[in-house]
């Protein structure tokens, strides 16, 4: 049925493991900062609702963090097992960057995570708050180093090639490569949006079940307040990222747009929908808006976007995949904006309690951030092909020399283990989210909240 060689199986295996892994950091990055905000608000106001939410979401964070660490370690091993050609060629750059992540971010998280999770009643409130902030900083620093490495693979600079391997000459240029600032901002905002959607969906779920206490209202209010700021900001950052990609990876943009040929000097249309055909070099059944592609991508009606046929066939990314992955990401972004606008309109007077249609929509949008992150990752990585280091090393030259049989067996083992272990972990997470924040507190603390007059306060 499938005539895949070892190279394709290695790509599928890496895509599978990374797709699993990226889910967990996308949640923990935002949740860590959310926990820091909750604890800071509690220390300032002494409103026990903030403590209630902190203790609840810290459990969600802990499970996500654990699964993220495990899946990340497995992914890192594949650089040596399946992609030894890449490790030999570019290891002098990617190796130190990953080491910096371990020496800074991971050590910071590991050093303070225990205090954060188990030290609420064992250390002073300021020290505990400091530990939470350090964990949040650690998650962001991890994002910094990982994206520095990945961005260098997208827009490499600050190196020379000696004896067939990469040698760094300017570490600042390596780290702060042309695409890094945009990709870091885009991913960080995406992680915060993903966490906000999860918080909103959890609050909406419990509101639908008839639970309308202060914790539920606070989750909805804080999550929607963050979304109304971050979703429009993400649109702006995404536009800037697109312009950067057009400058340094024009073939990727042409593939994303499904744009195969320019017509004379006419401005480039925006293809909304269609079916890209790489063999026929056209997008079939397309629905397009004239000139809008030029306006969005060049901010001008006089310029054209490079077409895919302007690049050699062996240098073209697969338009069929990135065309639709980008539209999934963008379409979900529009739905997120709708949720943010609708929710903040209802936020005045907390009118979402009697709006079951909105609450159901919010629950359905809960996992949309994760789907959008995955779609964006596919757009970025598939759009980089056929290069592993853009314009420098081809992916086919980076793979190890394994045969089809061992790659097939290892892929099957990964699928079974990942689906089993992370399936159970995900089931446990959903179970905790359904139980709600009240279960994170002992009965006497819940009684204290009711007696404090904060039950109906958002």
Predicted segment positions?
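Polytopic transmembrane helical bundles with strong interfacial aromatic enrichment
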Residues: 1-458
């Amino acid at each position: 049925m499938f005539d895949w060689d070892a190279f394709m199986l290695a790509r599928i295996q890496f895509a599978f493991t990374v797709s699993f892994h990226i889910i967990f950091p996308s949640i923990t990055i935002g949740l860590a900062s959310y926990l820091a905000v909750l604890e800071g608000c509690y220390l300032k106001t002494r409103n026990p609702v903030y403590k209630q939410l902190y203790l609840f979401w810290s459990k969600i964070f802990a499970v996500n963090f654990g699964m993220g660490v495990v899946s990340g370690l497995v992914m890192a091993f594949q650089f040596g097992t399946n992609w030894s050609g890449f490790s030999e060629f570019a290891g002098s750059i990617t190796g130190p960057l990953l080491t910096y992540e371990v020496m800074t971010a991971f050590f910071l998280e590991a050093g303070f995570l225990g205090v954060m999770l188990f030290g609420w009643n064992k250390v002073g409130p300021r020290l505990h708050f400091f530990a939470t902030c350090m964990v949040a900083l650690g998650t962001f620093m991890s994002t910094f180093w990982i994206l520095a490495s990945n961005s260098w693979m997208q827009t490499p600079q600050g190196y020379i090639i000696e004896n067939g391997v990469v040698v760094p000459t300017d570490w600042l240029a390596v780290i702060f490569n042309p695409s890094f600032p945009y990709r870091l901002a885009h991913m960080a905002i995406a992680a915060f949006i993903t966490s906000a959607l999860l918080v909103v969906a959890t609050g909406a779920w419990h509101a639908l079940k008839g639970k309308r206490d202060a914790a539920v209202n606070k989750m909805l209010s804080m999550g929607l307040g963050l979304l109304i700021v971050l979703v429009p900001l993400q649109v702006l950052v995404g536009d800037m990222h697109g312009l950067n990609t057009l400058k340094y990876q024009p073939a990727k943009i042409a593939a994303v747009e499904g744009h195969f040929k320019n017509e004379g000097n006419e401005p480039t249309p925006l293809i909304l929908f269609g079916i890209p055909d790489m063999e026929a070099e056209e997008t079939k059944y397309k629905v397009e808006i004239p000139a809008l592609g030029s306006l969005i991508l060049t901010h001008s009606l006089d310029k054209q976007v490079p077409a895919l046929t302007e690049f050699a066939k062996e240098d073209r990314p697969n338009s069929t995949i990135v065309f639709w992955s980008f539209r999934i990401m963008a379409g979900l972004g529009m739905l997120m904006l709708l949720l943010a606008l609708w929710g903040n309109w209802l936020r005045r007077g907390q009118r979402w309690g009697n709006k079951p249609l909105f609450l159901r929509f919010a629950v359905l949008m809960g996992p949309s951030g994760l789907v959008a992150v995955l779609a964006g990752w596919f757009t970025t990585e598939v759009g980089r092909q056929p290069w592993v280091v853009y314009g420098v090393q081809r992916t086919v030259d980076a793979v190890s020399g394994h045969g089809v049989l061992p790659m097939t067996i290892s892929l099957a083992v990964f699928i079974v283990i990942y689906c089993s272990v992370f399936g159970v972990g995900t089931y446990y997470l959903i179970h905790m989210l359904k139980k709600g924040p009240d279960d994170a507190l002992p009965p006497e603390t819940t009684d204290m909240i009711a007696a404090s007059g904060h039950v109906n306060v958002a």
